[in-house]
Design a protein with these regions (language model features):
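Non-catalytic C-terminal interaction segments of nucleic acid-processing enzymes
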Residues: 2-3, 8-9, 13, 22, ...
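Leucine-rich, amphipathic alpha-helical/linker segments
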Residues: 83-113, 349-396
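A short, conserved structural fragment
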Residues: 44-55, 313-323
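A short acidic, leucine-rich amphipathic alpha-helix
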Residues: 22-30, 291-298
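Short amphipathic alpha-helical interaction segments
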Residues: 2, 30-45, 299-314
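Active-site metal-binding core of divalent-cation-utilizing nuclease and nuclease-like domains
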Residues: 52, 95-162, 375-385, 393, ...
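Accessory beta->alpha helical hairpin/"wing" motif in late/C-terminal subdomains of nucleic-acid enzymes
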Residues: 53-79, 321-360
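Short beta-strand(s) of the beta-wing in winged-helix/HTH DNA-binding folds
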Residues: 21, 47-50, 66, 290, ...
């Protein structure tokens, strides 16, 4: 195949930014969509590029393209450099490909951000980061650079705070764009990024993926004013002292993306459907979930649920354990690794906390024999755990029936809030946190499922953390509204005693 200068430019763009779709490639190359579609078809016929499918809750199904081994060799030849140099200086090696495939859903959102920025600034570039605190660096005109940081769904407060601390110590960018999964964590991140050295802007991941370039969805670390992406990037200053990442020591030409690779861990983001990814997120949030409860949270029937679970079972992503005659669902170690790598968190820590695997293979199944510390605790108190799951299913079902939207439903490890009261660090540890969007506005609440708080001393101990929390200004600061505390009782007797 003969390559024209425009073809070499398109291949070079895919070498710098693998797994762009056609529309994103058109926006970043400055060529028409029709021309890009035509050239991609020719590249596929010549074996210069390969493609994978990708879809998520925030990104509609699309095909994403990357250079094949033949494409890497051809681009190196056209640019007059050894292909080994191309492998070490651009993210086209097999090692880089696997890393980006593991983060494909996150990469898709960041590419949407870059596509929006290309509408008002050109030329525009993006450099992926392998181990730096930022996910990528957006290269603007006039030597300006903006760091892009995505906070994943499974990232905990401590891990993200460490990333932000490292980011502030990393030179080379004049602004920071932080993408957060929900309003609560956006407000927490806003406190972390406030202050020098670079100005920071934050937005919800859903808004970044679905809103247009002119939508005012970006917020500064202080003040309530919302800015468009153009306005936010207008504050980016030229940066100096950039510290480049150390290149990979061992690189190799990319392997073909054969159908046999679909079971590989790094291919899961391309192999899984949106519904399957949603099911994995819910099982990850609520370990030991009953299949019926999962169906209610997903809003699907029994037949569809059976199909989803069969597929996840086949890929080895979930574990089914029978306890008291009822099946319970949890993420397998492989499923935990999939979520951890998607969100740039530690696989080892995820397994240490949540693994359902037995500590002793010969010991009978029991909560004492579960290796994950938090999974063990939830299984030990399974009656309470299932009660909270049951309440969640009722909430999700009623929200759908009444035309409301369940915006946020956080499990205990994300629902906890930490604050200072009388110079001491305090916390509230609810069973869940929910945010529901109704016709009359947003309603938020902490859930407390009560079975034993029937004695005065016990009741006081349960309510004291909330009284301290609401005595500060943090509830409004953390949520943008005042959440209620919803106490649910198992029977009328417990309710009477509590009240």
């Amino acid at each position: 195949m003969r390559l024209y200068p425009g073809d070499i430019e398109l291949l070079g763009t895919l070498a710098r930014m693998p797994f762009l779709d056609r529309l994103e490639l058109a926006a970043l190359s400055g060529r028409s969509r029709a021309a890009v579609y035509q050239r991609i078809d020719r590249f596929l016929e010549a074996g210069l590029v390969e493609s994978v499918g990708q879809a998520s809750e925030l990104v509609t199904p699309t095909r994403r393209f990357c250079l094949s081994a033949r494409g890497v060799r051809r681009l190196a030849s056209e640019e007059g450099v050894p292909f080994a140099q191309l492998l070490s200086t651009r993210p086209v090696s097999e090692q880089w490909r696997r890393l980006l495939l593991e983060r494909l859903d996150a990469a898709a959102v960041i590419y949407r951000l870059v596509e929006q920025a290309a509408q008002f600034t050109f030329p525009l570039g993006l450099r992926w980061q392998r181990a730096a605190p930022m996910d990528a660096v957006l290269e603007l005109t006039e030597g300006r650079r903006a760091a892009v940081v995505r906070q994943g769904r499974t990232v905990d407060r401590t891990g993200f705070a460490k990333r932000i601390r490292r980011l502030k110590e990393t030179p080379g960018h004049g602004a920071v764009l932080v993408i957060c999964p929900d309003e609560t964590r956006l407000r927490h991140a806003r406190r972390l990024v406030a202050g020098p050295p670079a100005i920071a802007f934050l937005a919800l991941e859903r808004d970044v993926a679905l809103a247009g370039a002119e939508a005012a969805v970006w917020r500064g670390p202080t003040g309530a004013a919302r800015l468009t992406l153009r306005e936010a990037l207008g504050y980016a200053l030229p940066a100096s002292g950039e510290r480049s990442e150390r290149p990979l020591v061992r690189v190799s030409l990319p392997e073909p993306l054969d159908p046999e690779c679909a079971r590989a861990l790094w291919m899961l983001p391309a192999a899984l459907t949106t519904a399957e990814k949603r099911a994995l997120d819910l099982v990850g949030d609520w370990p030991w979930l009953r299949p019926g409860h999962l169906a209610a949270l997903l809003g699907v029937g029994r037949r569809r649920l059976t199909q989803l679970l069969a597929r996840l079972d086949e890929l080895g992503l979930i574990t089914r354990l029978a306890r008291a005659g009822a099946p319970q669902l949890a993420l397998s170690d492989r499923g935990l690794a999939y979520l951890a790598r998607r969100d740039r968190t530690s696989v080892g820590i995820a397994r240490k906390r949540w693994s359902p695997e037995p500590r002793g293979s010969r010991d009978p199944f029991d909560w004492r024999n579960v290796s994950g510390i938090r999974s063990r605790q939830l299984l030990r108190n399974l009656e309470h755990t299932e009660s909270v799951h049951w309440f969640n299913t009722l909430l999700a079902g009623q929200a759908r029936d009444q035309g409301s939207r369940l915006v946020q439903l956080d499990p205990p490890h994300r629902a906890s809030r930490y604050f200072r009261s009388h110079e001491r660090l305090r916390s509230v540890q609810p069973d869940a946190y929910a945010l529901v969007e109704t016709a009359s506005g947003e309603q938020a609440f902490f859930l407390e499922w009560e079975r034993r708080a029937v004695r005065p001393a016990t009741m006081a101990a349960r309510l004291a953390p909330y009284l301290r929390y609401y005595a500060t200004g943090r509830p409004l600061e953390d949520h943008g509204l005042l959440p209620r505390v919803l106490v649910v009782f198992e029977d009328q007797l417990a309710a009477d005693h509590f009240l």
